Amino acid sequence: MGRIIFVSFGLLVVFLSLSGTGAALNCASGWSGYDQHCYKVFDKPKSWADAEKFCKKQTSGGHLVSFHSSEETDFVVELVSQTLESQILWMGLSKVWNQCDWGWSNGAKLKYKAWAEESYCVYFSSTKKGWRSRACRLLGHFVCKSPA
């Protein structure tokens, strides 16, 4: 009887230790799992567009991280704090000004365009609360997210 309890306890410890690594969600090696998704922090800074392309190449369905709850945000911030000291991490939110549906105040359609190349993308901080925007061309670390 004592052996069964010991073995059961051992299996429970192994299961609990693997549940936070992504192993329970079939995440690739080096990726961490949370709520049916896999996450990985990358420490080589890239522009927003290059980071998004990179995430798409890493795994099927991969993108820059998106947040859908405060619990998910807390999970990713904790994951980042174990890997980086960076305060600027790209996330998959952007506003590309020259792709919006614009119109003139007099009702005329916008036909002539002279947009500057600057677009703004959103980053989050591993040490400060809230999201901020900055030029997409600037470099930042990033977190990729994919379905488990």
From Swiss-Prot:
Which protein, by its recorded name, is this? Snaclec B1
Q: Where is the C-type lectin domain?
A: 34-145
Disulphide-bridged cysteine pairs: C27-C38, C55-C144, C121-C136
Q: How does it assemble?
A: Heterodimer; disulfide-linked.
Function field = Interferes with one step of hemostasis (modulation of platelet aggregation, or coagulation cascade, for example).
Q: In which tissues is it expressed?
A: Expressed by the venom gland.
**Species whose genome carries this gene:** Macrovipera lebetinus (Levantine viper)
Q: Other remarks?
A: Shows greater sequence similarity to the beta than alpha subunits compared to other heterodimer snaclecs.
In which compartments does the protein localize? Secreted
Q: Would you identify the family this protein belongs to, as annotated? A: Belongs to the snaclec family.
Question: Could you tell me one molecular function GO term of this UniProt entry?
Answer: toxin activity
